[in-house]
Curated annotation (Swiss-Prot):
It comes from Chromohalobacter salexigens (strain ATCC BAA-138 / DSM 3043 / CIP 106854 / NCIMB 13768 / 1H11). ATP binds at G101, G103, R104, K123, D135, G136, R186, R193, D272. This is Protein nucleotidyltransferase YdiU. PANTHER family: PROTEIN ADENYLYLTRANSFERASE SELO, MITOCHONDRIAL. The keyword Iron-sulfur does not apply.
Length: 494
């Protein structure tokens, strides 16, 4: 998303809380819990600019910084905020669960900015009627991971939620171990999920579903308002955006790991970062979530899961649109995903033109990476240097016999391009990240933050915001992962 010059301060935010004007059982009004000794760890310049805020307004000793700290700790709300927890349902690992909703987070308010609306959602805000058996708290470990994930995905150009700030507190939270508490102020144009529509469909509340469709269109997709069938038009929009989103996940080696329908954004954003991972060694079957024993949400399953989730959403919309028309829209998913994936992978290979056989060239490159156990991200960086160096780095990264034959085909393909080698290298390095949110690096940041040192968090966040540009002295963040990095297990506990 574009970052623009800003001058607003925190107290100048204005809220228009449209969700609170929907039927009362769409939500429950809840006041955030107050946590002991809340301390700000970092404030995101990208998050500030999304809201139209001047990052300088949060400088040390600035009044807005203390106000933000109090907001993160549940000690205050901003004028115009109306905290609430949203109700929704969804399919979790393929099974419908009617008892879902915001269980640890609150929609604090919907800020109106020059670029549209932004939800301010406080994660770790305490228990709600939808907490089920949860304590409503968030831990520092998962909050750091979500904070960095938004920065990393935005830096890569992948649609995502963001965060304005990350804070910790003196609460001790029981998970697999006792962990420090935290709060995260998440930002998104909307938190509407596929599961919101599933809830209304399963409850046979067709009039309320029409209100929800109208709400999403009016708030976020006004160009669809004049459509003959607004629900069908909205579904087509969601299909296209979801296809592009998952294509980007596949191109950049990202595994969401918990693609339940309640974690799917109606706006095509990456939502709810849990046991996600950016792959190290290229492994199409990567499953970073140790609770996903059957690999339902493995890396190579994500495109198919996206289609399945969209089919559930389409079924939910059948009271408002012709089923055949919705099915026709659903058939647009795979071509849209393939087209976007091909575009992204051509760019990663330095190809501007479209030539028959490019898809096979890409697939054969990935086969080499899998055979070699090559690092997915470093291999692309090394390939970018191949045409301007002796290729030694590339041979180190992809040490397999078939590399030479593939490079001969690649060289032949490059003859159909107009760019010279140096220009192509620059273009490739502008889309192939040097700094990647690897699991072991996130763990190092977490351990430092738990020990009271937020400097690695701030440093890594700055690199992830622009992951393509090398910076002096930052070599450790770009180094190859150690062998033990592959044994780190992740869980859904947050």
């Amino acid at each position: 998303m574009p970052l623009r010059e800003v001058t607003m301060t925190l107290d100048s935010l204005r809220f228009d809380n449209a969700w609170a004007r929907l039927p009362e059982d769409f939500f429950t009004r809840v006041s955030p819990a107050t946590w002991k000794n809340t301390r700000l760890l970092d404030i995101s310049p990208r998050g500030c600019r999304a809201l139209g805020l001047d990052p300088a307004c949060f400088d040390d000793d600035a009044p807005a910084r203390e106000t933000l700290r109090q907001l993160m700790g549940g000690e205050t709300v901003l004028p115009g905020m109306a905290p609430l927890a949203q109700k929704y349902t969804g399919h979790q690992f393929g099974v419908y669960n009617p008892a879902l909703g915001d269980g640890r987070g609150l929609l604090m308010g919907e800020a109106q900015t020059a670029d549209g609306y932004w939800d301010l959602h406080l994660k770790g805000a305490g228990q709600t009627p939808y907490s089920r058996f949860g304590d409503g708290r968030a831990v520092l470990r998962s909050s750091v991971r979500e904070y960095l994930a938004g920065e990393a995905m935005a830096g890569l150009g992948v649609p995502t939620t963001l965060a304005l700030a990350l804070a910790t507190n003196d609460e001790k939270v029981q998970r697999e171990r006792v962990e420090p508490g935290a709060t995260l102020l998440r930002l998104a144009p909307s938190h509407v999920r596929f599961g919101h529509f599933e809830w209304l469909y399963q409850s046979r509340r067709h009039d309320d579903m029409r209100r929800l469709v109208d709400h999403v269109i009016e708030r976020h997709r006004p160009a669809l308002a004049a459509s003959e069938s607004p629900a069908e038009a909205l579904f087509g929009d969601v299909v296209a955006r979801t296809a592009r989103l998952i294509a980007a996940w596949q191109a950049y080696g990202f595994v969401h790991a918990v693609m339940n329908t309640d974690n799917m954004s109606i706006l095509g954003l990456t939502l709810d970062y849990g046991p996600y991972a950016f792959m190290d060694a290229y492994d199409p079957r990567l499953v970073p979530n140790h609770t996903d024993a059957n690999g339902r949400y493995a890396f190579d399953q994500q495109p198919g899961v996206g289609l399945w989730n969209l089919s559930v959403l389409g079924q939910s919309l059948t009271p408002l649109a012709e089923p055949d028309a919705l099915r026709d829209r659903l058939t647009e998913y795979e071509p849209a995903l393939q087209q976007e994936y091909a575009r992204l992978m051509r760019a990663r290979l330095g190809l501007e033109s479209v030539v028959e056989g490019d898809a096979q060239l890409v697939q054969d490159w990935l086969t080499l990476l899998a055979e070699a156990g090559a690092d997915y991200h470093r291999a692309f960086r090394a390939l970018g240097e191949w045409a301007v160096d002796d290729g030694e780095w590339l041979r180190q990264e992809v040490p397999v016999e078939g590399l030479s034959a593939w490079l001969s085909r690649y060289h032949e393909r490059l003859q159909e391009e107009e760019r010279d080698a140096a220009s192509r290298r620059d273009a490739m390095q502008a889309v192939n990240p040097l700094y990647v949110l690897r699991t072991h690096l996130a763990q190092q940041v977490i351990e430092a933050a738990e020990a009271g040192d937020e400097a690695p968090l701030v440093e890594f966040r700055r690199l992830l915001a622009d992951p393509f540009t090398a910076r002096p002295g930052m070599e450790r963040w770009a180094a190859a992962p150690p062998p033990q990095a592959s044994v780190i297990c992740l869980s859904c506990s947050s």
